[in-house]
Amino acid sequence: MYINYLKDLIGFKSVTPKSDGAIEYIDDLLKQHGFKTEIKIFGDSKSEQVTNLYAVFGSNEPNICFVGHVDVVLAGNHELWHNASPFKASQQDDKIYGRGAVDMKGAIACFLAASLDFIKNNTDFKGSISFLLTSDEEGKAKHGTKEMLQYIYDQGYKINFAIVGEPTCEKEIGDAIKIGRRGSVNFKLNIEGLSGHVAYPHKANNPLPCLIIILNELTNIKLDEGIEFFQRSNLEVTNIEVSNNTSNVIPASTEASFNIRFNNLHSAETLAKQVEEIIKQHCKEYKVDYKLEYSSSAESFIQNPSDKIKEFAKVVEHTLKIKPEFSTSGGTSDARFVKNYCPLVEFGLLSETAHKINEYTKISDLQKLYDVYYNFLMEIL
C-alpha cells in the first residue's frame, strides 16, 4: 500500500506552508482505521496558517510517534520533470518521481503502511502508535511541529519515542541514523564607507577592501577540529551585495551574508561574539562603520544513544544486514523541537535527490524502509 499512499501524497501540491489537502487525506485514512485524530491550524495571519495533525491509536505506553511534514519546496521548472508534472507521481521501472518523494512523503507513506499493517496483525499490542505531521517544516517552521508538540502535551499526551522520517541515508538505506543535528546561524554584515570618483580615492573610503579582508579571514578560520558524531564547524559566504553598476564610482556601502553550521562546541551567541571581534578589528583599521545582524534557527544538539535508539539501530542492522552509523550531518530539521520532549531517531530514505528536479525514490528502498518501521514496531510494542 505504501506505493499507493505515496502516489496519492505526491498529488497534493503542498508547497510550504500549505497542506493542499495532504494532511486531511491522512486524517481521513487514519480515522478509518480507528485512530483518534485532531487537526489544528496555527498562524498569525491567513498567509501564515499552518495545518497540523496529531493522530493516536491506543492509550498505553510506550507511545511511538512518527513525526513528519507534508510540505515540500518549490518544484522549479515543471517542463524539466518527468511528464512535466512534479505533482503527479510518475513510475518508471523501480523509481517513483515527484516532488516530495524522498523529502518526505515517501517516509510518511511507509510508516502509514507499516503502522496500519502492524495494527491489523497485532490486535493486543501493549503500547500506542501516533503521528505528528505538519505543513510547515521547509519554511519558517514557526507554527508547525514546535507549536503542535506544546499543544498535545497541554492536552495530556506524552510521546515516549519518536521517529522523524527525514531522508537521512547517504548511499544505501540503513547506512545512517541521525541522533543529533548541527546548529545554524545566519549573519548579515553591512559596511559603510564613503563614495567618490575612482580617480580620487583619497577623497573617498572604499568599503570593499575591508569586506574582502574580513571575509578572507572568516572563511579561513578554523573554528574547531570536529568531535565525535560531529564534523568540523563550517562558515560559508552566501551573498555579496554592492549595488554599484557604475565602473568609475567607489561604492558607499557593501553587504555580505554568510552562514555557520556548527557543532555543540559552540552556540550561536559565542560564534557571533567571535565573528564580531574580527569585524570590529578590521573596520577600525580601515576607518569604516559596520552593522552586524545575526539570527539562529537552530542550536546544535546531540543525544546519548538511549536503549530505544540502540534498539532501533539493531532493528536496522538485523533487517537490512547493514550496520548504521550514528550521524549529525545535514541541515536542520524538526528534530530540534522533538528532542525537548523525548528521545528520537531520524531515519528515512536516501537524501541524494531531495529538493532536486526529478526527485525520486526507488520502490525497493520504500520496501526496505517499510520493513524497518514494521520490524521496529514489532520489537518495541
Curated annotation (Swiss-Prot):
Gene responsible for this protein: dapE
Outline the subunit composition.
Homodimer.
Q: What does this protein do?
A: Catalyzes the hydrolysis of N-succinyl-L,L-diaminopimelic acid (SDAP), forming succinate and LL-2,6-diaminopimelate (DAP), an intermediate involved in the bacterial biosynthesis of lysine and meso-diaminopimelic acid, an essential component of bacterial cell walls.
Q: What is this protein identified as? A: Succinyl-diaminopimelate desuccinylase
Instruction: Spell out the family assignment given in the record's similarity comment.
Output: Belongs to the peptidase M20A family. DapE subfamily.
What Gene3D superfamilies does UniProt report for this protein, alphabetically? 3.30.70.360, Zn peptidases
Q: Which UniProt keywords apply?
A: Amino-acid biosynthesis, Cobalt, Diaminopimelate biosynthesis, Hydrolase, Lysine biosynthesis, Metal-binding, Zinc
Which PANTHER family does the UniProt record give?
Answer: ACETYLORNITHINE DEACETYLASE (PTHR43808), N-ACETYL-L-CITRULLINE DEACETYLASE (PTHR43808:SF31)
Sorted alphabetically, the Gene Ontology BP terms of this entry are: diaminopimelate biosynthetic process; L-arginine biosynthetic process; lysine biosynthetic process via diaminopimelate
Protein residues bound to Zn(2+) 2: D103, E138, H355
Task: Give the molecular function GO annotations.
Answer: acetylornithine deacetylase activity; cobalt ion binding; succinyl-diaminopimelate desuccinylase activity; zinc ion binding
User: SUPFAM superfamilies of this UniProt entry?
Assistant: Bacterial exopeptidase dimerisation domain, Zn-dependent exopeptidases
Please name one Pfam family that this protein belongs to: Peptidase_M20
Question: What is catalyzed by this enzyme?
Answer: N-succinyl-(2S,6S)-2,6-diaminopimelate + H2O = (2S,6S)-2,6-diaminopimelate + succinate
